Amino acid sequence: MGSSGSMVKPISGFLTALIQYPVPVVESRADIDKQIQQIIKTIHSTKSGYPGLELIVFPEYSTQGLNTKKWTTEEFLCTVPGPETDLFAEACKESKVYGVFSIMEKNPGGGEPYNTAVIIDPQGEMILKYRKLNPWVPVEPWKAGDLGLPVCVGPGGSKLAVCICHDGMFPEVAREAAYKGANVLIRISGYSTQVSEQWMLTNRSNAWQNLMYTLSVNLAGYDGVFYYFGEGQVCNFDGTTLVQGHRNPWEIVTAEVYPELADQARLGWGLENNIYNLGSRGYVATPGGVKENPYTFIKDLAEGKYKVPWEDEIKVKDGSIYGYPVKKTIHS
């Protein structure tokens, strides 16, 4: 819920703050260092204003910005863990909060970099590392993530998962998080205004279809090319919006989150307990439900044979429209 009570720690559950961080205009490594210090300052100042704060979330690209001419260069990329995450970890430890941060990560094995998110706990430990499974093609050059969708224990009875921006447009990503036990899905984004309605819609549907809370926040402001919509959103496990931010840079969207209620719904609901019902179809007629997979796309995806009927007619299948070189190697 969002209320005047969203200034202090609730008796159960936890208090979160979603930071509608101003989109950084980054031209050099020095600019990145300034953003890191600004993020650290924001952690401390937000904690001082909201003493009960336990989870603070920064949007995608808040650390390194979206300079598409430089974002894959050695100067702009970071290692994870590395000096940057060490600084975030120290800030989380000092302020006694969980923090969610965005890092464009140098590929430790060489090759294309990753778009990465981390969760750091109040002891300064990195407890989750996630690489974006679904880069926003054809705009983004990031390599598709290879760490799956990890889940970690968070504050107030929460089990946390993180997805990044475009990931949230795929219902399969939210379902994977819930299937692995997450009762809170965090979505950090760097979308421009063209998809703001769809962003809010999928935040709600991801919550409802999986009986979990969704905590979502986007960059805010203008970087000289696009306007980023902010609009931090906290959705209840029934798909309703508890709190909705506006388009203001630096707006702090706070909410009280009660993971135990999502857990109770998953255990106690009959109607619309769809995260369970998916694997127990028709359990009234068939005790225990039908377990066999009826879905062609799931079978084909699992076998590496996913192909839509119109695939041969699709016009855009590489990044050339945004100036990326066309690569001939096809992943098998």
Swiss-Prot record:
What gene name is listed for this protein?
A: amiF
Per the entry, what this protein does is:
Is an aliphatic amidase with a restricted substrate specificity, as it only hydrolyzes formamide.
Kindly indicate whether the keyword Hydrolase belongs to this entry. yes
Known catalytic reactions = formamide + H2O = formate + NH4(+)
User: Start and end of every CN hydrolase domain?
Assistant: 14-259
| Active-site residue numbers | E60 (proton acceptor), K132 (proton donor), C165 (nucleophile)
Q: Which UniProt keywords apply?
A: Hydrolase
Q: By what name is this protein known?
A: Formamidase
The Swiss-Prot or TrEMBL record describes its family as follows: Belongs to the carbon-nitrogen hydrolase superfamily. Aliphatic amidase family.
Q: What InterPro entries does this protein's entry cite?
A: Aliph_Amidase/BUP, C-N_Hydrolase, C-N_Hydrolase_sf, Formamidase
Keyword Hydrolase assigned: yes
Recorded hits in CDD domains, A to Z, give: aliphatic_amidase (cd07565)
A single GO molecular function term of this UniProt record: formamidase activity
| One of the GO BP terms on file | putrescine biosynthetic process from arginine
